[in-house]
Amino acid sequence: MFNLCYKGQKLQRIVQSKRMEEPYFTFGIIADIQYADKDNRLNYLKTSMRYYRNSLTQLKVAIKEWATESIKPKFILQLGDIIDGVNTKDNSSTIALERVLEEMDKLPIQFHHVWGNHEFYNFSREYLNGSKLNSRARENRIDQQVGTSESGETNDESFYAYHFSPFPKFRFLLIDGYDLSPIGREKTSLKYDISFNLLKEKNPNEDLNSPTGLEEEQFVLFNGGISPSQLDWIQSILTSSDKKEEKVFVVSHLPVHPDAADTMCLIWNYPEVLSMLQSHPCVVGYLAGHNHEGRYCMDPSGIHHMTFSGVIETPPESQAFGTMYVYEDKMVLKGRGLVEDRTLHYRDPKNMQVGH
């Protein structure tokens, strides 16, 4: 009898231990696919090869793995630059996008899309707002807490940002890094004028994509900034999450910390954005793409800044995507190929420091 009771208690402990190890939820992450039906060629800086056709193959591999994982991801974060700007040279942008979305549609899991510079090389904001890349539209239908813009409209001055909660006490906040940007605005808009004038003030180079000689290297045309209206909106969401004691992941195409990317890849007004994020104890992570080599840092306040390797510059023999396992006290990244495995513990609000 004693032996049977002992075995029963041991089995119960094993079951409880296994249950404790199960994550609250998981989600997939992939960045900078930049698909095009084009031959391989060097990137803009001539420092790395771009594998245009293979990027679609890489996506197929990622989708197959997510589909067969024992714990199905609740959603996938697509961190921007889904197709490459080179598609505009032969008017193949729509065809290229359809090919990528066709593969994504094979996975019965919601994709959340952020918009990067290559989205705006290929399409207007008006087009993007009406496309499948507007994952905000779906959230608007199921969650009345989703933010759209300062006016709640998708007009030419609005920004593409929203938030959602996949599990109690967790929230994802997708922000628009090209809210202020000449490439993301119609030339007739007020934000275009503001963005272009700011860029010219900070960057006197003839080639506005060049950071040569700049004191603030982030002020190049392929980056963008966060407007005061979007900053106010972000502030309100984070303040609400602080009160609810939520854990918030901020998601953007552009990184925001100088140790998580080259300075020439950061949001224009990253010091302002970073300072605001660090002041809110709810923020636990910042997920971005854009800097294709990928990078990671934990800032002094305890926020984990993860910049994911770009699929477009991943050699055919490797991979670049990951799955995040979210627990009560930590998040565990299972990376593939160029994306490293990481165990990331949440910051302690009692020991918060603010600093870059």
From Swiss-Prot:
Keyword Metal-binding in record: yes
Which top EC class applies here? hydrolase
User: Could you give the subunit structure recorded for this chain?
Assistant: Monomer.
Q: Which PANTHER family does the protein's record reference?
A: MANGANESE-DEPENDENT ADP-RIBOSE_CDP-ALCOHOL DIPHOSPHATASE (PTHR16509:SF9), PTHR16509
The record ties this protein, via CDD domains, to: MPP_Nbla03831
InterPro entries membership: Calcineurin-like_PHP_ApaH, Metallo-depent_PP-like, MPP_ADPRM
Question: What keyword terms does UniProt attach to this protein?
Answer: Hydrolase, Metal-binding, Zinc
Under Enzyme Commission nomenclature, its number is 3.6.1.13, 3.6.1.16, 3.6.1.53
Family, similarity comment: Belongs to the ADPRibase-Mn family.
Q: SUPFAM superfamilies annotated for this entry?
A: Metallo-dependent phosphatases
The function of this protein is: Hydrolyzes ADP-ribose, IDP-ribose, CDP-glycerol, CDP-choline and CDP-ethanolamine, but not other non-reducing ADP-sugars or CDP-glucose.
Q: Which residues bind Zn(2+) 2?
A: 81, 117, 253, 290
Binding-site positions, Zn(2+) 1: 32, 34, 81, 292
Q: Which reaction does it catalyse?
A: CDP-choline + H2O = phosphocholine + CMP + 2 H(+); ADP-D-ribose + H2O = D-ribose 5-phosphate + AMP + 2 H(+); CDP-glycerol + H2O = sn-glycerol 3-phosphate + CMP + 2 H(+)
Q: Does the keyword Hydrolase apply?
A: yes
> What Gene Ontology molecular-function terms does this entry list?
2',3'-cyclic-nucleotide 2'-phosphodiesterase activity; ADP-ribose diphosphatase activity; CDP-glycerol diphosphatase activity; manganese ion binding
**Provenance organism:** Xenopus laevis
Q: What is this protein called?
A: Manganese-dependent ADP-ribose/CDP-alcohol diphosphatase
Q: Which cofactor does it need?
A: Mg(2+)
